[in-house]
Amino acid sequence: LGAGTFMAISVFDLFRIGIGPSSSHTVGPMRAARDFVMALTAPKVSRVVVRLHGSLAATGVGHGTDNAVVIGLMGETPEAVDLDTIAERLAALDNSEPLRLPNGQALAFQRARDIEWDEACLPFHPNAMVLTAYEGDTVISTNTYYSLGGGFYVDQACADRGGLDEDKTALPYPFESANELLTLCQQHGLSISELMLENEKAWRSEAAIRDELLTIWHAMRQSIDNGLEATGRLPGGLNVRRRAHSLHQQLLSPPDNQRLIVTSFTVMDWVNLFALAVNEENAAGKRMVTAPTNGAAGIVPAVLAYYLKFEPDACDADVVNFLLTAGAMGILCKKNASISGAEVGCQGEVGSACAMAAAGLAEVLGGTPKQVENAAEIGLEHNLGLTCDPVAGVAQVPCIKRDAIA
């Protein structure tokens, strides 16, 4: 992995609690829409128009982009919105009830009229959306946003400066490439998780870092548990049946002739199961953690859940070290390549997540920094070439099984 322009990225920029089915097509647009209306200063807004471009338009229906934008215009955030109220609020809007902005102002909003779909890509990124606010026929505010994957987004001003709105936080151990990371670990006698912990202290205390990482893990664990319990078929029109629940029951009660067979393949069944559970929850639009995206959100929690289930001495400290190390690899992918499926294909999502999970596992198993980096490299290269080609634009086929395979 080569070097790029320095910017400070936190592990908490990669692991974010949000909702499914897509970090780039659901989480990012919701955040961007909220950002737009929160910045409005005009006393009277009569209309807001949203134009979705490129991939947001091409696959936005299947990813619920229009729904996400509407909820964002209401001032909601992916991490805090009450999922049980979304369908009711959208139905009310479609029944001609007004859309209420965060400042309390109500305006008529018709999704068929005020959300436009334009598959033409804008130059900066394939995931683009233009929001315009009117007072009567007069434009009072407009901005263009680009959803970069993983819930990251930038507006046009930031795009004109070249990309991410760079965080200039001074880190004790800044690195732009894997080589730099390994050199720092060797020079200072640190593991990758130890180095990442020191860098994270630039933003928050060690206690806060550990607490927040455990909160992230608990959200991941909850998505696994919810996925194992849920049955039925997934929304989206493909009629895909949830499989995690029935597979879980099979693993808990294997046929008599398999009860005494415990092999590495048995363990892999559990890893596959955990990944399926998470991604079925994601496809259903439930609460998720980007890792580093929603489309690849099953891989990191599945591998971590495997470690905690089958390693007798596993503890909370391992969870923290696993996620810190995984975050380091995600940061390298984000800085030097991309985690956006719309930009570089599924290899950028599933490949990055596989590298992150492999690195985290190698770390908690006692690997040296070089071994951790090698694990990440192997995980990444085995997913090279995967394109982002979901059937009918819905994050289900082949997305769910790709997580299990990775």
Task: Annotate each predicted stretch with a short phrase.
Residues 24-39, 301-313, 358-366:
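Alpha-helical support elements that line or immediately flank enzyme active sites
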